[in-house]
């Protein structure tokens, strides 16, 4: 269970829980592959936590087609 960032904070950045999970998984995969981190400080030690923190900060968005 995640404590930070809260699901409510995350859902302010995306339309649905499904979109949130897909965006977080994609960003975590990108971080695993060596993409640069977008924040200077992270509370979580894992890439999925980094992805969620970046989403909450508004640094990662879903690309609209």
From Swiss-Prot:
Enzyme class name: transferase
Catalytic reaction equation(s): RNA(n) + a ribonucleoside 5'-triphosphate = RNA(n+1) + diphosphate
Assembly: The RNAP catalytic core consists of 2 alpha, 1 beta, 1 beta' and 1 omega subunit. When a sigma factor is associated with the core the holoenzyme is formed, which can initiate transcription.
GO molecular function terms noted in the UniProt entry: DNA binding; DNA-directed RNA polymerase activity
One GO cellular component term: DNA-directed RNA polymerase complex
UniProtKB keywords: DNA-directed RNA polymerase, Nucleotidyltransferase, Transcription, Transferase
SMART domains xrefs: RNA_pol_Rpb6
Protein EC: 2.7.7.6
NCBIfam families xref list: rpoZ (TIGR00690)
Pfam families given in the database record: RNA_pol_Rpb6
Example GO BP: DNA-templated transcription
Family named by the database record: Belongs to the RNA polymerase subunit omega family.
Keyword Coiled coil among record annotations: no
HAMAP family given in the database record: RNApol_bact_RpoZ (MF_00366)
Keyword Oxidoreductase: no
Described function: Promotes RNA polymerase assembly. Latches the N- and C-terminal regions of the beta' subunit thereby facilitating its interaction with the beta and alpha subunits.
Taxonomic lineage of the native organism: Bacteria, Bacillati, Bacillota, Bacilli, Lactobacillales
UniProt protein name: DNA-directed RNA polymerase subunit omega
């Amino acid at each position: 269970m995640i404590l930070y960032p809260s699901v409510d904070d995350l859902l302010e950045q995306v339309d649905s829980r499904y979109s949130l999970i897909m965006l977080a998984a994609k960003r975590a995969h990108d971080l695993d592959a060596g993409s640069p981190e977008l924040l200077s400080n992270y509370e979580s030690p894992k890439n999925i936590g980094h992805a969620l923190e970046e989403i909450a900060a508004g640094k990662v968005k879903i690309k609209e087609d």
